[in-house]
Amino acid sequence: MLCLHNKICRNKLHQNILAETEPRTTISFYKYFDIQNPNLFRDRFYLQMNELKIFGRIYIAKEGINAQISVLNSRINAFRTMLYTSHPQLDQLRLNFALDNNRQSFWMLRMKVKKLLVADGIQEPNFNCFNANNYLKAEEVNILLENPNILFIDMRNNYEYEVGHFQHAMEIPSRTFREKLPIAIKMLQHNKERKIVMYCTGGIRCEKASAWMLHNGFQHIFQVEGGIIGYVNRAVKLGLPLKFIGKNFVFDDRLGERITSDVIAYCHQCKNSCDDHTNCLNQDCHNLFIQCRQCTKKYDGCCSLSCQQTLRTRITRLKNNFIK
């Protein structure tokens, strides 16, 4: 019988990855294109990825694919061949290679069929998410950043912008992409004739945002090719100065990639300079926040005294039950 889902417990998965001796590379990619049967595509793609022992998180929808994966270095070429032949729309698809491969990003393969690749809250039936194609390479980005008449818009969540962003980029204050789209339209409504450059981590959010801006009458919309990851990789390759400062937040176990030595954020508890995200160890909370090492020790990895007390109470209860 075909295996179409992970059936190994989390502890065993961690043991397996720790036992690996071959390094892995984190890769991300996306593509907006029409998938007639997402469930069939998902099952076939899962079998192909699982055979190559690829880990990661992959979303499939009628509007395309969005993937962040971890690949054994010896199987990167085999993965490319498989990907480029799995669907005509994926042939020669751009791959974003992670900026930091010193830490493990994924421990298992998860692949889900979703209604949308990115939850956008858009209700207009005539909206075309495929209508965005003005991509800027790193060298073009650096030139445009020097022009005060051009607006750079960060389409990531506020906690991502907090730890790193392009110099002089405008933040659209919100915690989700769904919230961000109407706010962006309102904030920029008097700039429909100006050149606007949008960016995000790897490109998928700013591509949909670019199409939405064009749909709403904005005339000159551009996006950074490959997002922050694509920009940094190309800038480093060409020896260009990096105009992105700080850390690039990522949605995997690493929670961030160091781009420059600048630390532009602060610990949410003591306000000292820090840009390390973590999740509150109180599982009833699990809040994502920035915490320095001193506060990690002081609060037992929790975001508040209340969560710390809840965690300690739970640990005490577990110890007492174990003794019994």
Curated annotation (Swiss-Prot):
The keyword Oxidoreductase belongs to this UniProt entry's keyword annotation: yes
Family: Belongs to the TrhO family.
Reactions accelerated catalytically: uridine(34) in tRNA + AH2 + O2 = 5-hydroxyuridine(34) in tRNA + A + H2O
Domain Rhodanese, residue spans: 146-233
Designated name of the protein: tRNA uridine(34) hydroxylase
EC annotation from Swiss-Prot or TrEMBL: 1.14.-.-
Gene Ontology terms describing biological process: tRNA modification
Keywords: Oxidoreductase, tRNA processing
Organism listed in the record: Baumannia cicadellinicola subsp. Homalodisca coagulata
Purpose of the protein: Catalyzes oxygen-dependent 5-hydroxyuridine (ho5U) modification at position 34 in tRNAs.
Ribonucleoprotein in keyword set: no
